Amino acid sequence: MLILKNVTAVQLHPAKVQEGVDIAIENDVIVAIGDALTQRYPDASFKEMHGRIVMPGIVCSHNHFYSGLSRGIMANIAPCPDFISTLKNLWWRLDRALDEESLYYSGLICSLEAIKSGCTSVIDHHASPAYIGGSLSTLRDAFLKVGLRAMTCFETTDRNNGIKELQEGVEENIRFARLIDEAKKATSEPYLVEAHIGAHAPFTVPDAGLEMLREAVKATGRGLHIHAAEDLYDVSYSHHWYGKDLLARLAQFDLIDSKTLVAHGLYLSKDDITLLNQRDAFLVHNARSNMNNHVGYNHHLSDIRNLALGTDGIGSDMFEEMKFAFFKHRDAGGPLWPDSFAKALTNGNELMSRNFGAKFGLLEAGYKADLTICDYNSPTPLLADNIAGHIAFGMGSGSVHSVMVNGVMVYEDRQFNFDCDSIYAQARKAAASMWRRMDALA
């Protein structure tokens, strides 16, 4: 048993602040929180926290780790006047240039930086059309190396190679889900990685692909992870070719349920939002990505039952993401305040609970010991009623001191327990090679 002694225990939702308490952890689970636990458990080891903030682990609920080597990209990118041209000229060339090495180092770098930013878990959405089979296992290797809890999937699409590409994407999703099932039975590795069934977006998945995805969801017991209504084009395409709203079309194939994760959703219809809520599915808002891609703003956030936050590939700094989500909402005239976005941030843990079959997101006995530990010397009182305001206007990822995942300190006193410099050096080489491959693509 390990006791984190003298902590400031903070929950964002339901909001709660307890100063000077201890947290007792047995294996990967919290067993007690309260005063003087070292007296109750005299044989336990302990770490003195000196009043540091300890909160339930932070989750990035939608990310693209395959884009980790795109920072400062020097490949020749044609002008991108709109969202679709941005996809075609940048992202759909980058993902075609990925190979096993570049994907592995992209996964490593993104995992390292997620943890340094305070994330204990990331929900990833992957694409590498030239390297489909085995790609999700490569990402899993990166997650396990660093100690990050994660979910991933392959974004099924027909955009490069038609029905063959659809089949290969679905097969990789199924293969990976079954690999996870076998790994859980073997218990030789920590259960840190789970699977979704992935799809790119409705406008690149025909009905034949949705039927394949329905069968994959049914066969594996996993939920769908898909972009939808990120841009008006997706909605117009669905109306023109299928005569249906986006989520209504997905629901026709039994793809909207309590494990479904829909990213973006800026232009979902009122009926689609009702459907999403009735099926208890999740919408993940990616404020900075929407701003960067100039796709518009989601004016319906207050109507969403299960709202979570993600980055869509712009790092994994969820402190920053929550700030932008709130500020952009205010700029757009929205009605929500910081506490609503703090709740959305914590909702990522509900996604973990639904998919890992365990309890995440509270500092209570029986919950997973996934914890974010911060140095934050507040200049004003830190209270349950104002903790969301402290994050919106002050506390950031620079305060992250340590991160615990599954009861293990994977990042302690701002250090990993392995050499990171060599990983970054190799990542730079892999990035340069990938950029050259991008330039060689038509």
From Swiss-Prot:
One MF term in the entry's GO annotations: hydrolase activity, acting on carbon-nitrogen (but not peptide) bonds
InterPro entries per record: Amidohydro-rel, Aminohydrolase_SsnA, Metal-dep_hydrolase_composite, Metal_Hydrolase, MTA/SAH_deaminase
Pfam families: Amidohydro_1
EC number: 3.-.-.-
Sequence positions that bind Zn(2+): 62, 64, 227, 312
Keywords associated with the record: Hydrolase, Metal-binding, Zinc
Top-level lineage group: Bacteria
Entry's induction text: In stationary phase.
Record protein name field: Putative aminohydrolase SsnA
Natural source organism: Escherichia coli (strain K12)
